[in-house]
Every structure is written in C-alpha cells, then in structure tokens.
C-alpha cells in the first residue's frame, strides 16, 4: 500500500526545478547554445561534428553512502550519470572533470570519490582530465559534501540522435537499472526514518549504459534515447519526444527490484513513478525492438 511520503515533503520540488529551467531558457539560448533542456548540450565543433556536454551533481546520496562505508559508489555514480547523459544524443564520451566540495577536506573521502569515478571512466574509455576540490566550512555542515562532474563527448552530425524521427507506433525498449541509482535520495532518507533497508540495490552505483547503447545502435534504428533520472520513466521520455507524441508505458511489463517494493510501502504509486526509475534506468525509442524488452509504445 502506498504511504504519504512525497519528494516535496522531503525538501525537493520537481515542479520548481522545471520552472527554473524555463526561467533560464532565454538567457541560455541567447548565447547560441543548442539542446538546452536536453540531457546534453551541443556545441558545433565544425561543419560535421558536435561536442556534447552534461553536468550533474550526486545530490544527497553521499549522506547515506558515507554512513554505510560505500562512498566510492558515489564517485562511480557521478561518472556514469554524466556519461549516460552524453550518450543520449549519440555521442561517444571523451573526457570528464569532477568537483568535490566538502565541509572539510578528508583525504580518504576524496580518494574514494575520485577512485570510483576513475573506475567508470576506464570502463568507458573516457579520460578523467582534472577537476576542483574546494573546502567550504560554513557552506556545508560538518560531514556534508557535494560531488559533481562534467562529461564532454563527440558526435558526428549525421549520427545525432535527437528524437526528431520518432513516430507513433515506435517501441520503447527498457534497459534495467542497478537499483535506485542517484536520484530520489532525499525521499529515500525520509522513508528510512520509518523502515530500514539493507539490500545492495539501495546504494548500488548507477549502471553505465555505454555498451548497451552501442549494441542497440548496431542492431536497430535508434530514434531517441532517455536516461531515467529525476522525473522517472515518463518524465524523462517526454524530454526526447517530438511535440504531440507521448509514451504509453506498460507498468506491468517488467519486475521491479525489491528496493522499489520497499519504497512502495511508504510512497504512493504516482509519486514512485514521478521520482524513481523503478527498475528501468535507460530507454530507447526504436522502430524494431530487436528482441529487447518492450515497456511501451509511442502514440
């Protein structure tokens, strides 16, 4: 049975985040930027190639990961999250920069985060070229930190995936997540006040989808890609679909990992779908699903 906990009550407003994006749109687009509001911003390198860039923060997951001795997972999260965003436009990752901002510098803590990020970068063939470490007493409380990263990739203009060719009847292929990944932890921590959870998928690092995306592109015509982060499956698919088209999701077409069954005891179904990936970490819109798990259709 769904409970009463919501993301808003936990201190995070997705509606306000959406409003901020729209408020900033004119200023950002006035600089000549392409792809504002997409998973990755685009910059023309020359007539044939585009740079794709994405930046994100790990949010409040480190607060829980540190308590359980799994801070390294958050470094892996951050690298995978940014690389996954860049993949959505068809780009290959080139390099990553990281930003670590704790209340006070802790060598072991910084090393865990950067080593976790480096492990994912090695797997992706993406260079970790540098970053910034800032000690910010007075900004964060004792023991608190922020960890962010920026990934830059490269895509040939002819290979760009932007959702423009999506048509009614196209299939939505769902790729499984490793667990909660890196979104919704303010709400997770609120639920933990009522009931503990020890399963590995709660703090498992974000899955890297590079090999999956490459395989899909070899096997079938990929028309859009969505990284399922804050906003859930439907919210993130809507970011890559042409105006007037929607994704009808069959929520019974896959089995949810146990961590989401635990959350469902405290969070209403609509809120679960709006905040969490619910076991689907990445979506591809394709004409032919090529034997993959279909979780919905475009209409």
What are these regions (language model features)?
Residues 2-11, 20, 26, 108-127, ...:
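Glycine-/charge-enriched secondary-structure boundary and capping motifs
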Residues 14:
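Conserved "HGTGT" condensation-loop signature of ketosynthase/thiolase-family condensing enzymes
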Residues 17, 58-62, 156-159, 180-182, ...:
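Short, acidic Gly/Pro/Ser/Thr-rich loop/turn segments
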Residues 23-178:
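Glycine-rich phosphate/pyrophosphate-binding loop regions near the starts of catalytic domains
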Residues 160-163, 183-187:
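A short secondary-structure junction signal
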Residues 172-180, 225-230:
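A structural signal for small-residue-enriched, beta-sheet-centric alpha/beta enzyme cores
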Residues 180, 188, 297-299:
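Flexible glycine-rich active-site/ligand-binding loops centered on an Asp-His dyad
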Residues 185-196:
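Short, compositionally biased
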